[in-house]
């Protein structure tokens, strides 16, 4: 249970830090810094533990590279959703359903068994996404961030990845990143499936190094193409927040891995699944975000579904 709590805390804090990073430094710089720090930590672990790469053949390596690129797509979609003004609690809850995507793929492709609790969890998570993503009816659910409050709602006016654009007022803050959050969940889910399928053969550390190394390599290769279009002024704090997001995300991943190694997979997965509660509370307290009743019910359904998937 302790590993699950540490993982939940790490991933929850990482989501809050990611929002600050995305809105201060832009998506590209934020993801590059966060992913780069993650690779540095993995390299340090590799130097300490000296894992074997004997299981990383050509086919396995290509699959892990694919997992890394899918993960990169997920990160870009997640940070972009936050940069566009999506509510961090809502975006985090929807993107967290990637576990359900991976579970369904494991059942459909690998023939793994999904219990009753897991099945109910998948249904709850999908229903929660439908509620959270639905447009509010005219005159209903008007308690959202962009309708009555009109306070600190922020949107993005410059649609260039990596650019830190000027803020502008929007009408519905909490729905701005929903489509991107769904893309994030799908990318994470498919990437996680590939990573989970080939990690036993390659070893978890070797697999993580190949996957994360591929994503950072692509980001570095894209740097010359985007350099002239980036807004470098005022991004120092954003880079610091991105580093914090990468560090806390790595803490969550390591805690989750340790929980699995200790034979506490179900408990660790179930407890860590509640991590969207942290960005949800953080969004309300730190950023004055307010979800509509329908969206809040959807988020609760998503979290409940994730817990059941972890137990199932």
Labelled PLM ranges:
Residues 104-105, 117-136, 150-163, 294-311:
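Hydrophobic transmembrane alpha-helices of multi-pass small-molecule transport proteins
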Residues 11-12, 67-75, 98-99, 185-189, ...:
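Transmembrane alpha-helical core positions of polytopic small-molecule transporters
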Residues 26-27, 86-87, 110-115, 203-204, ...:
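A helix-boundary/kink motif common to multi-pass secondary transporters
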Residues 13-25, 76-86, 94, 190-202, ...:
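Juxtamembrane C-cap of transmembrane helices in multi-pass membrane transport proteins
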Residues 36-44, 94-108, 214-218, 252-255, ...:
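Alpha-helical transmembrane segments of compact multi-pass small-molecule transporters, enriched
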Residues 1-9, 17-18, 23-28, 33-66, ...:
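Membrane-interface interhelical linkers
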Residues 42-53, 102-117, 186-200, 248-265, ...:
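Hydrophobic alpha-helical transmembrane segments in multi-pass integral membrane proteins
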Residues 1-11, 55-71, 114-127, 203-217, ...:
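Structural signature of hydrophobic alpha-helical transmembrane segments
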């Amino acid at each position: 249970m302790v590993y699950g709590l540490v993982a939940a805390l790490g991933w929850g804090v990482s989501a809050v830090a990611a929002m600050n990073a995305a809105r201060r430094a832009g998506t590209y710089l934020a993801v590059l810094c966060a992913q780069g720090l993650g690779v540095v930590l993995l390299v340090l672990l590799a130097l300490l533990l000296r894992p074997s790469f004997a299981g990383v053949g050509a086919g396995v390596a290509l699959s892990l590279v694919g997992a890394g690129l899918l993960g990169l797509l997920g990160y870009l979609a997640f940070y972009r959703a936050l940069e566009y003004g999506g509510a961090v609690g809502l975006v985090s809850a929807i993107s967290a359903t990637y576990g359900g995507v991976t579970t369904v793929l494991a059942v459909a492709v690998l023939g793994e068994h999904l219990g009753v609790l897991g099945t109910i969890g998948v249904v709850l998570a999908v229903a929660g996404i439908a509620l959270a993503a639905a447009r509010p009816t005219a005159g209903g659910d008007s308690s959202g961030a962009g309708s009555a409050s009109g306070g600190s709602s922020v949107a993005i006016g410059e649609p260039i990845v990596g650019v830190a654009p000027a803020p502008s007022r929007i009408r519905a803050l909490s729905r701005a990143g929903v489509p991107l959050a769904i893309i994030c969940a799908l990318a994470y889910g498919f990437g996680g499936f590939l990573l989970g399928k080939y990690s036993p053969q390659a070893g978890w550390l070797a697999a993580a190094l190949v996957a994360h190394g591929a994503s950072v390599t692509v980001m570095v290769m894209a740097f010359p193409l985007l350099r002239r279009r980036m807004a470098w002024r005022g991004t120092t704090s954003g880079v610091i927040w991105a580093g914090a997001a990468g560090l806390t995300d790595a803490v969550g991943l390591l805690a989750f891995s340790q929980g699995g190694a200790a034979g506490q997979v179900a408990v660790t997965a179930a407890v860590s699944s509640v991590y969207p509660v942290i960005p949800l509370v953080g969004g309300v307290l730190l950023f004055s975000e307010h979800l509509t009743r329908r969206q809040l019910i959807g988020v609760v359904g998503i979290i409940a579904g994730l817990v059941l998937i972890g137990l199932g």
